[in-house]
Amino acid sequence: MLVTGGTKGIGAAIAHRFAASGAQVATTARAPSASQDADLMFVAADLGTTAGVDAVVKEIENKWGGLDILINNLGATATPPGGFETLTDAFWQQVLDINLMAPVRLDRAFIPGMLERKNGVVIHIGSIAHIMPPSQSTLAYASAKGALRTYSKGLSRAVAAGGVRVNMVSPGFIETSGAHGMITEIQQNRHISEDAARQYVMNMIGGIPVGRPGRPEEVAELVAFLASDRSGYIVGVDYLLDGGTIPTV
């Protein structure tokens, strides 16, 4: 199986969850993390480019001949200052390449082999930002994740009869190492406690009814379930994992 963006945060939690269950796991990122697990296959690549995607596909095909499980976890954006009008065409394209086109290109490369074997699972990791963008500077990211959701639903119907299940998981505020760094920065800048800084972030997104951020391991558990035979009748669903942040049904 392949987990994109699998060296830290949610991706690392997913990779370690599957590896602990005995799966052969490959991860990708632009560079390995300092704590890269030696038991995981690692491919360095910039998936925001076609060349990067091609390099990963070639490496996986040479190593395993294809995939049974593809977790399109990679997602990234910047938050430039200013309003929506400051988001340039180049910025939009970069965000779309990473958050939408990388999954599209990887799916296009690996799903045909899954269809030949009549077995496969594809899970796209989205974000609740596609429902509720937290700020103007995240509009490109939110739009890309919204497009990924539409694509994921359509793709699921196209390949389900061939034995390939496609689903999506859209996390809310998950306290990864990166998110914890943001909490620490807010704590220092505002001269408040860590708990107060964490609550400040939670309030920024409209609050979390369960009273805490999510953990990467909680996302990994849902992904593991969706990749298992226990979810064999689940197709084309987008699971919001947000502690109740999104107030609508």
Residue positions per predicted region:
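A short, exposed helix-loop element centered on a Lys and neighboring polar residues
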Residues: D107-R108, K153
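Substrate-binding pocket helix/loop in short-chain dehydrogenase/reductase
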Residues: P80-F84, T88-L96, M204
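Short C-terminal tail/terminal secondary-structure segment
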Residues: P81, R212, V223-A224, R230-S231, ...
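Alpha-helical segment proximal to the catalytic Tyr-Lys
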Residues: P112, R157-A158, G232
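Catalytic loop of short-chain dehydrogenase/reductase
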Residues: I123-A147, S152-A161, F173-I174
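Conserved glycine-rich cofactor-binding loop
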Residues: T7-K8
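Short, small/polar-rich loop/turn modules that mediate ligand/substrate recognition or access, typified
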Residues: A160, R165, I234-G236
